[in-house]
Amino acid sequence: MSAEIEEATNAVNNLSINDSEQQPRAPTHKTVIDPEDTIFIGNVAHECTEDDLKQLFVEEFGDEVSVEIPIKEHTDGHIPASKHALVKFPTKIDFDNIKENYDTKVVKDREIHIKRARTPGQMQRGGFRGRGGFRGRGGFRGGFRGGYRGGFRGRGNFRGRGGARGGFNGQKREKIPLDQMERSKDTLYINNVPFKATKEEVAEFFGTDADSISLPMRKMRDQHTGRIFTSDSANRGMAFVTFSGENVDIEAKAEEFKGKVFGDRELTVDVAVIRPENDEEEIEQETGSEEKQE
């Protein structure tokens, strides 16, 4: 096991449930988010202003509509492909009607994406659910079924491409080469994600929205009680990013983001692999096994 992997693994295992860094991050939005009167807008053009978005809704909902486009400093020199916004209406809304009428409207030469707003509590608990399961080169499994199985075989020893998997009674099943597995047409597998990155930050970096991000959170152990719990703030260093639209060139997306620096880490990017439907679930070690973070 390399020194880098051992160091990263030990740092995670030594965290206590009482560590201040594990406390959930305070919301960065000024808008009080209530899904009954607030919507989330993704894929907002950099040139778009709060007033530009407000004018889109004023005719139907009146001048009391308020818009917030959070401003964030990017110290790594990377400028995200788009911004996001929160729109708050003066009364309760019919979300489906708003989505039908305003989703994919073009503002400043860019389609906006209307999504349901989620409270900070919902964002902490919620996970992306989609169709099919994806496996990345580092052995991530089942991320888009709402259940996460960390595909590691032991501390610091994660499976790489097409690694053989254990079957029942210790019998190994024949491995399936990665290049023979079906690739996703709209999803990227991202490795070496900063441990403290949130779904919203990942979404902003890739120019999409939080609902299109699968960001597995770490399993950790309370040093005092021995209890295993899911971290509120530390992810497992990997993510899956899905891009919406009918004409997504996922190979081009992979090339666009390959080698980009997010936070202080250079990302490893690949097109996600779709896990076969008959691929059996495995019970893997939930602790002491983390992705390499150099």
Curated annotation (Swiss-Prot):
Species assigned in the record: Saccharomyces cerevisiae (strain ATCC 204508 / S288c)
Subunit architecture: Associated with snR10 and snR11 small nuclear RNAs.
Primary localization: cytoplasm
Modified residues (N-acetylserine): S2
Listed name of the protein: Single-stranded nucleic acid-binding protein
Modified residues (Dimethylated arginine): R135, R137, R141, R145, R153, R155, R159, R161, R165
Biased composition (Acidic residues): 278-288
InterPro entries linked: Nucleotide-bd_a/b_plait_sf, RBD_domain_sf, RRM_dom, RRT5_SRSF_SR
Residue list for modification Omega-N-methylarginine: R125, R145, R149, R161, R165
Protein's GO biological process: negative regulation of translation; negative regulation of translation in response to stress; negative regulation of translational initiation; stress granule disassembly
